[in-house]
């Protein structure tokens, strides 16, 4: 007796759902169309309204109209994005599920003549399923080439560096992140197991910055490994067992206003290593009987600490009781304002250090000066102040360095033969408005500086972005490699990776491009909202022929979501923003910044195999939005530092504040379709990207809600890669907690291991007692949202392998 009522209720429910979906698509589609976007959503909304009405009337034409909608959507989807599974998914998921629902007999019970209409709908759904399955195996974003150059039997020797060691942040101070070890290779890497785990005990506290991160790459020399923790505790470790030998605590005092709380690495000095430092030893002025072997630790409150590498005691003959005050002669000095987060370099005579400066807080911040200190006494030998008329002018009584001069926060690199330190710089803060910048403060911004490490004199400089308004720093340690040019001559090259995706390949002797660089016109105005007051723009920007950024401008076709609903909202949001490609000016309306603030390349850099003339890297692509907020430049400084680079930043002293955020959907997912992270292999003989693969899954993308399936999508990563003579690339970095190994020849994934916390660090490898190990810090990243921890994890082959 009640069955017809039940049927009516189920049908009514379906009609309501389809009707609501139709109204959402129709209203949103009209909004999008008025902004110049696709009219598909209007058409889909109208067809769904017809389906709802026909279903309400119990007419079989409801399924015919739905089949037409499905077929049209399939054709439209392929036209927009081809056979990209993740791009197709939000276009087809809701409609596909709803189509299957309409085939349930209980939903259409009481409707006559359904035979042919069900066949039509079933056919379109089958086409959609076949398309999705096909797209899984035919990813248009991936490049599936193969590097032909074989690995030589013998590796090039590096003076002063044992094959079994990893004595510097990038293994060598040339920043190559390549090891000649090959016990672990592409055939047996699948057998790696955890060999040991060390827990440092140094965890984020309630008083720490939101940007607390664990990004350290350990160094290993002989029988000692050294790491620094997030609070810059220096720990000496037995590399064979993972047992702690000793610990030195610099007693860092932090608060939540620190924009960064991290230590990416330390520097090692051995007075007996005369082979590596033959050139710079000519400038040596001192020695130390107390600390002939020492480890230098950059401390976030503005100190450089020297510790005896054998005993763990402070080198009291260095500076003042083992440390130099990097805040000395600093203008507007305050804890965390000038913040060394990355390792510098050491030579036979000098330790060179730079640091970050708080971004976007005010126009009265510390200097980004680069300094060279006597490696034994800590005496200030030279300065290079990037904002001064005379960068080498030494500070004196009553004088300070130039405030807000461009800083160098990334790791430095060093050519021991040329005695040149290579310094990647950013822009003088505030980053997003530069109307008051002087020519002097822009001269060395966003550049690669080649500086004589013994004298501090500039050898050459190359600017990668002019008048930067997008935070497009040079963020990576440069990599030095001798490569063959087109004439077959060996050229000493430097690879300068940038946030823009440009990889500038220069002769490291003189800064001249090896791979062509072209100045191209860039946008000068915005189309929505007022033009920025008091601002000016560079008419052109440099572009390298080697570029890992997407080469096409984003369009609303590239917008994404978990469903067609949030995808529609992302398309609307995209159309409402100012965007005319890379270098679109910031605006009050809001500007899409792509590549975004994280950049295509970050501090992880790339790995260069000089023996094989190949490089591997892990570029990312995640759009951001910057929105200028008009403000009185003379307003009082009422807010403390936010402890992060995102959100609202006050930019005191200039006529705007700024809000910076990732470009996300209403569900908190990126509005740009995946992939957001890749691994790639480049042939350095041709500078061709030979292979490129998505990396990372959505497993940990919603860590506070639930764990998602480990489906490869290509997620962002922070941290670098390494490679070995065993034809293996190792990389962590991604938002899911894994360490992975890839085949350097073709990019095939060979192995992965689940990490106990986020692996936003660059791994390293070494050998001891005849066994090769791979080590990564799994400690998480505050603003990146990965699981925090304190784990140093080592992997090795089982003894029977």
From Swiss-Prot:
Active site: 471 (proton acceptor)
EC number: 1.1.99.35
Recorded GO MF terms: quinone binding; quinoprotein glucose dehydrogenase activity
Membrane-spanning residues: 39-55, 59-79, 94-108, 119-138
Record Pfam families: PQQ
Domain of life: Bacteria
Subcellular location: Cell inner membrane
Cofactor(s) required, per the database record: pyrroloquinoline quinone
Misc. remarks from the entry: Acinetobacter calcoaceticus contains two different PQQ dependent enzymes with GDH activity. GDH-A prefers 2-deoxyglucose as substrate, the specific substrates for GDH-B are disaccharides.
Summary of the function given for this chain in its UniProt record: Catalyzes an exceptionally high rate of oxidation of a wide range of aldose sugars, including D-glucose, galactose, arabinose and xylose, and also the disaccharides lactose, cellobiose and maltose.
Protein name: Quinoprotein glucose dehydrogenase A
Organism: Acinetobacter calcoaceticus
